């Protein structure tokens, strides 16, 4: 096993916490963005922010 200094362990913990935060709070907005960027399937109405909010 690799020996890490206390400072290196703290930096890795911060990196993992930051990654967790980004994945948790960034996944849904990313999916929504990609959906709007791609557009609707042929024959389906265009997505709008209101249709997203009201279902």
From Swiss-Prot:
It is found in: Mitochondrion outer membrane. It comes from the Eukaryota. The keyword Amino-acid biosynthesis does not apply. One of its GO terms (cellular component) is mitochondrial outer membrane. One of its GO terms (molecular function) is protein transmembrane transporter activity. Residues 37-55 are mitochondrial intermembrane. It is a single-pass membrane protein. GO terms for biological process: positive regulation of protein targeting to mitochondrion; positive regulation of type 2 mitophagy; protein import into mitochondrial matrix; protein insertion into mitochondrial outer membrane; regulation of protein stability. Changing residue 29 to L: In GMPGS; uncertain significance; severely reduced interaction with TOMM22 and TOMM40; does not affect mitochondrial localization. Its main location: mitochondrion. It is linked to Garg-Mishra progeroid syndrome: An autosomal recessive syndrome characterized by a progeroid appearance, severe dwarfism, mandibular hypoplasia, hyperopia, and partial lipodystrophy. Forms part of the preprotein translocase complex of the outer mitochondrial membrane (TOM complex) which consists of at least 7 different proteins (TOMM5, TOMM6, TOMM7, TOMM20, TOMM22, TOMM40 and TOMM70). Belongs to the Tom7 family. Required for assembly and stability of the TOM complex. Positive regulator of PRKN translocation to damaged mitochondria. Acts probably by stabilizing PINK1 on the outer membrane of depolarized mitochondria. This is Mitochondrial import receptor subunit TOM7 homolog. It comes from Homo sapiens (Human).
